[in-house]
Amino acid sequence: MNIIKINDNSNKLFYIGGVVRDELLGRESLDVDITYVGNAIEYCSKFGEVVQVNPDFGTVRVAIPSHPSLCDTHSPIGTRGEVTVDFASTRSESYPKKGHLPVVEKIGCSLREDVMRRDFTINALAKSVTTGEIVDYVGGLEDLKNKKLRVLHDESFIDDPTRIIRGLKFATRFGFELEEHTKKLQDEYLVNINYDMSYKRVKKELIETFQPYYTPHPSYGHPLPVGARGGVTFQKFIDQKIYKLVTPNDVEIPKVNVEGLVKKYCTPHPSPLPVGARGEEKPPSCSAAIWLIYVGILGDLSRLPLTKIEQKILDDVPKEVLKSDFELYKTFQNARIETILLYAILKDEVGARHYLDDLREIKLDITGKDLQTLGIKPSPKYQVIFDEVLKAKLQNPKITKTDEIEIAKKYLSD
């Protein structure tokens, strides 16, 4: 556990949630904050420099001098020799509008009240900073032992439907299963969904569920192997009809091996693809929208607040099957990998693989300067020439620059 131990005898400081869960599972947790039973803002003002405060939620960030008599830490040390630590006040919440952000009812509530607002019992464990004692009000230790995900009350998914997606994330990350009654509650909600919910939060959970398998993520500190659990997560996403949170339409799992495509063509660390036909730099082979490869198959993503780039990825997926190498190349030469893989899943896997395996590295050596040297004046005709040369090179990638110039010479008399 990457923590800071503060010398405090009040026994009011606790680690709560994922950090306790991860420690008990023997996993590293990089996102660590400390909860104070009471008002953390008032408490922290006594011993450190307050650098950020959110009074609405009772959270505070404090810069604490890294002196041995005050604290013992493995956290990053600041430039002035201090440690920055996040503290949270215990708080109780309610959901006056189901499916949307909760409202803070009380800051400085009891520890029991604070843990009762959590999603699953395994995330409702508390550990005393002072004594190291584990406090378990809801049976989280037993569920952790039995690898079960259990909600804290029957209204949990109604209050916050995104907990269903988080359950999927925890199930595949830790190899856990929904406890029987929790599974029943989930199934009931997915049959009677209230689509008046915060889709900004839905999108956030979808990204955190599918994205971490391919890119660095704070919860891991390093990328997991590509495709390590993405396929399992996707299968559960479809089989359990969790996709119903996004669209009421029925969806069948594609016959294409989605996990295999992602594993082969998406790298954990972004790296440039080969340049295009005229020297354009290709987009990276793995970007921040890999999650769209999975969610994009739903078709109707109108409820999700997509960025311009994310919407473009979807809009750029060809509606029809591309029939020639030239069409494949011209369509995908500047496309993102997510667009190409969505085309593979939805339209033509063979064509997409052919482009990625055989065509995308092909580039022209001839340039506009070469055409000027031949006496061809700059005009829209240049693009016609480049396209004809490209067609020839797609048929025979071994042709040289000299061969390309010979093809261009055919247009001297035009």
Where is each model-derived feature located?
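Catalytic cores of the polymerase beta-like nucleotidyltransferase superfamily
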Residues: M1-H222, R229-P270, G276-D414
